[in-house]
């Protein structure tokens, strides 16, 4: 990073570390964008450029090339949210297909990614997850969702590109899990193409993993799994509180850490059937995976194991892994500033809620600034 980028990062994480400032800034930004006030340039020059790759695929190329020179791969994520109509779902499908076309034969971009509710309505996913009976029209709409999933995964399969299916809120996750395994049964028979995301801050995810392996219908499947802690903690807890139900999220960070570690144990006990991504900003989790690989005599660049972090976060982890020849990528969101605001707000809220994350980022940035100052003197 340049000195300017380091200073900007320090400034941003200072703001993110204050939950009150995050709430106020978020409200002001939403208001400004809603009424088309001239704030886009300011957002683009600060938080957008720090956490996002650009406004288009081509616009991301300088970042992609810069990362790859340091042995860090990229995953392009068209991160717009809030689609509601069949037209929008079909447009999103076209975009995902075009991204796969754009990245095929690009060594620096080994994965594609998509958010399930970009291909179908959230309400439909919720109803399917609850096991409620569809109307005739809803059955037709759901068949189109399945068809969109299949088209994306088939395109990835045809071009030998791995594809990550994002996890979402607990309300919709059961339907996503079912679609993910349906796609794996079609496209993961010889090698892993489709990867489902498992949020280990949920209390039920170990049971889900065991069910995957033990289900006889999956005997021929090579599983693709991306393990994360989770990105919707505040929202999940708030919804559970409003509904008067038990939260699906682990009670404490320690419980989540234990769950994540048990998930890693599960993966390494079943590596003959699993290819996986350790998508974590937690140094201890990354070190644990490295130790487990060493104990099993797995080479650092084994194609079945990847590490992933978000662009703009945990550069110390990503670049140190790359330096040691591990497979690592950065998720690189792109799109218009306005469309990416839900993603950027979630990043700010997540960093505020994750204990110690912002402090670690600030300390690492300060250490690098100090190192550069010493080199000058």
Where are these regions (language model features)?
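Positively charged, amphipathic and often flexible ligand-engagement surfaces
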Residues: 1-377
């Amino acid at each position: 990073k340049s000195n300017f980028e380091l200073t900007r990062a320090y400034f941003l994480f200072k703001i993110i570390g204050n939950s009150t400032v995050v709430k106020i800034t978020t409200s002001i930004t939403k208001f400004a964008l809603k009424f088309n006030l001239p704030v886009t340039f300011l957002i683009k020059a600060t938080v957008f450029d720090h956490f996002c790759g650009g406004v288009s695929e081509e616009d991301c190329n300088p970042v992609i090339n810069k990362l790859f020179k340091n042995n860090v791969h990229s995953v392009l994520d068209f991160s717009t949210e809030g689609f509601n109509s069949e037209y929008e779902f079909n447009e999103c499908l076209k975009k995902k297909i075009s991204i796969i076309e754009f990245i095929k034969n690009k060594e620096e971009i080994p994965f594609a990614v998509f958010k399930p509710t970009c291909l179908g309505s959230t309400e439909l996913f919720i109803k399917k997850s609850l096991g409620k009976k569809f109307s005739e029209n809803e059955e037709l709409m759901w068949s189109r969702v399945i068809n969109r999933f299949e088209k994306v995964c088939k395109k990835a399969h045809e071009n030998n590109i791995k594809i990550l299916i994002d996890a979402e809120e607990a309300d919709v996750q059961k339907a996503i899990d079912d679609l993910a395994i349906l796609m794996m049964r079609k496209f993961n028979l010889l090698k892993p193409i489709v990867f489902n995301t498992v949020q280990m801050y949920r209390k039920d995810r170990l049971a889900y993993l065991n069910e995957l392996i033990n289900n006889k219908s999956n005997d021929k499947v090579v599983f693709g799994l991306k393990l994360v802690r989770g990105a919707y903690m505040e929202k999940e807890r708030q919804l559970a509180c409003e509904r008067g139900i038990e939260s699906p999220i682990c009670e404490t960070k320690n419980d989540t850490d234990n769950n994540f570690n048990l998930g890693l144990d599960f993966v390494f006990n079943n590596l003959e059937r699993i290819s996986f991504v350790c998508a974590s900003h937690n140094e201890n989790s990354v070190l644990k995976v490295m130790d487990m690989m060493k104990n099993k005599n797995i080479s650092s660049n084994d194609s079945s194991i990847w590490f992933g972090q978000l662009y703009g976060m945990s550069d110390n982890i990503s670049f140190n892994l790359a330096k040691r020849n591990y497979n690592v990528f950065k998720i690189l969101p792109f799109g218009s500033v306005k469309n990416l605001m839900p993603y950027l707000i979630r990043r700010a809220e997540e960093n505020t809620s994750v204990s110690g994350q912002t402090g670690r980022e600030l300390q690492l940035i300060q250490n690098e600034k100090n190192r550069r100052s010493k080199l000058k003197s």
